[in-house]
Each structure stands twice: as C-alpha cells, then as structure tokens.
Amino acid sequence: MPVSLHSPAQQRLAQIDQVRHTVMTEGRSARAMLVDSWGDRSWIERSWRRCLGAGRRPDQALTFDVLPAQARRRTEEANQTLLTAARPVLDKLGRAIANSHYFAILTDAHGVVIDVNGPIDQSDRRARLLTRIGVDLSERAVGTTAISAALAEQKPVWLHRGEHFFNDTAIYSCAGAPLFGPDGQCAGMLDLTGIEAPERPELRHLVAQWARSIENSLALARPHALLLRVNWPGCGLGDDADGLVALDGDGNVVSVNATARQMLAQLGTGRLQAHSSELFAMPWELLFDAARRDRPVEVPLWSGLVLQVLAQSPGNVAAPRSSGHDPRLPLRDVEAALIRKAVAESQGNVKEAARILGISRATVYRKLGRK
C-alpha cells in the first residue's frame, strides 16, 4: 500500500528538505524555521556549514575513495589493538542486526573503514561503496555522515536520509558512536547504516551500547595486575555498565573506561597518570585483598561518596608491598580508621578534619558514630 504523503515518515523527510533549503540555499540558520527539536541537532547544521565553507556543494558526485594499498596496511597495523578488541563484539552485533536491514562499520579515529559486519548486500553497489576496507568516510571525503558527526561531536548520533550533506548519501540512514581508548582519547567509531531503510533512531542507543562493549574490551586488553569493576551502591556489577579501573602491582592506574571516568572525577578526560590512593580513601593495598574475597565491597571516595567495587585478579598476581595495615580489616573499618586519624591529626577539630578529607562534618560524625 502506498505511503500517505501525510504519514510521519513523509512529514519527516519533508521537514529535512525544508531545513536543507533554508541552510544550503537561503543561507539562513535552521533555527529560524523554529523546527521542533532541531536545537538538539544543531551539530548537523554545523557540519553542513563546514562542508559549504570548504567549497563543497550537495550535488557534487562522490567517489568514495579507498586509501592506497600501503596506506591501508599502515592503517590496519596502527589499529590492530582496536581490531582485536572489536571483532568478537562485531560478530555478536552482526547477529543482533541480521534482520534489521542495517549493517555495521568500524572506522579508525580519522573515519577510515577498518572492519565491517552484518547483512551487507554485496550485489548492491551502494553497500559495497561503504564497506570496502580502507574507504575514507571522513567529513572531508564524504561530508556529513554519522561517522564524521560522531567523531566531530564525540557523542552518539542519528542521521536520516537528507540530513547527510551530499545528495549521493541521502539514501543512507546511520547511527554512530565514538570509541574511547583506555587513555580517554578517541580511538575510532562504530556505525550502523541502512540503505533506503525505515528510520530507526533507537539504533543510536543500540550502537552506543555496543561501542561501550568495544571500549571495555580495549580497557581490559591493557596488561594489569588488578581489575576494579565499579558502580554505585545498589547497582549490579559484572556487565558492560561497569566502570573499569585497571591497576599495576604498585597501585598505579594503567587503564580505565569512559564510565569510570564519569564516576571518578580525578581521572578526568584524557588523564591516566594517577594512583589508586588518589581515587579511593583507603590504603590501596587493601584493594588487592578485596580480590581474594570474590564479592563486591563498598569503598569510600575522598568526596565522601561510596562506590561498590568488585576487585578481580587476572591470575596469580604477586601481593603488593605491605603498608603495615592488617589485610583482613574490613573496608568499612578502614574508612572509619582514616577519619579517626584525620580527626586526631587535627587535634580533635572535626571541622578541620572534614575539610582535609573533603567531606561534611555530618559525614565525619556519622562515620565515627557507628563505631
């Protein structure tokens, strides 16, 4: 049955055409149209304007160039860690989207395709163009896409048909999410693309989840002596929603995922040179003891907040150097001991002890009151 011109799908495409005309032909901002919800998609207009500023026109033909053989080899070698971490995840993702008319594309941090998966119709030239290893899908090469937008905006995006810059790419609908490595830097991106497919904005959530799985694989690939799975109290532990903090044998942070960076402000974006004692308000050696408990424990932060931590050893890890603390001491008692020590060093001045610890006086009284 033909689709009504008044169907939501047709109205959406008509709205996109209006916005394109406003921005690309009239040179006005899309905001001038007062289009519902366009404000949170202003990144599309920014990308369009970058393309226009570079002298590109929407009706220009695209060639979807592949890098020369030597450059492809260099790209593959440079991204071997990402490929190794991503391939098992891509295999699972490919099965998950097998009946969706969308396929998966993995690119490096520059938008060059390094792997693909899912239901790719090799008889369709439009699919083949995008899924060749080494094809450059950056904004510079093919304009506004979910790939270029995810890399530029550093966040998950959804792009439908004419929201792409070039007419040649207006047949595609794409969801994209950036991939961040253990050092907090963008390592690449994951894309889901359909050709003349129904709009599926929920794929933005799906691609973000699978991107998180790849990020976790990257974090776990770094050699480490202890892995800390962290989450807030009351939340489960043991899946891709965990924050991951990996330590060496001296308690130094060697790898983290993006979730952990959001929970532990000291790590910040791009910061990796930190010691676990800067993160957790307890002797760091006790984290290794927690791995022998094989169950989550509550660990205090210097802010006064508490994280739930599941410490896991990758094998027979040598015990860290002794700090003189009893390794059998429950972690909640360590927290109270640290507070008592701060109060003693402040000569009983609870206000000063709270300031040093970065917590409230009420927290100090509460923690001490339970002993």
Task: Tell where the protein language model's regions lie, with residue ranges.
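PAS/PAS-like sensory domain cap-loop motif
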Residues: P119-Q122, R126, L264-L272
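PAS-family sensory/regulatory modules and their coupling/dimerization elements
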Residues: G162-E163, I171-G176, L279-H325
